[in-house]
């Protein structure tokens, strides 16, 4: 059974495995740099370790592959018969990270 981990990043929990590419909330670092996730909630595999609230000494190491923005989300508010409308767009920034190692 392959080793996996559940990490907390950007206010979310993400299940990761070695070699997997994940999309997370923007991390302020350059593409190609290494990032370490210290908030590991669970490490699974042959023996599962559940943290209370995090697993002590466990880290997940990844490499930032690219920074980008998601597709545009358009919101439109409209009041009928009043000539009132408002259109607003938003593109959420993200970071693509490739997981290199799970250290338990």
UniProtKB/Swiss-Prot annotation:
Keywords: Ribonucleoprotein, Ribosomal protein, RNA-binding, rRNA-binding
Any one GO CC term of the record: ribonucleoprotein complex
Domain of life: Bacteria
Gene Ontology molecular function, alphabetical: rRNA binding; structural constituent of ribosome
InterPro entries: bL21-like, bL21-like_sf, Ribosomal_bL21, Ribosomal_bL21_CS
SUPFAM superfamilies named among the record's database cross-references: L21p-like
GO biological process: translation
Cysteine pairings via disulfide bonds: none
PANTHER family found in the cross-reference section: 50S RIBOSOMAL PROTEIN L21 (PTHR21349), LARGE RIBOSOMAL SUBUNIT PROTEIN BL21M (PTHR21349:SF0)
NCBIfam families: L21
Subunit structure, interactors included: Part of the 50S ribosomal subunit. Contacts protein L20.
Listed HAMAP family: Ribosomal_bL21
Its biological purpose: This protein binds to 23S rRNA in the presence of protein L20.
Family the entry assigns: Belongs to the bacterial ribosomal protein bL21 family.
Name of the protein in its database record: Large ribosomal subunit protein bL21
Native organism: Streptococcus thermophilus (strain ATCC BAA-250 / LMG 18311)
Lineage of origin: Bacteria, Bacillati, Bacillota, Bacilli, Lactobacillales
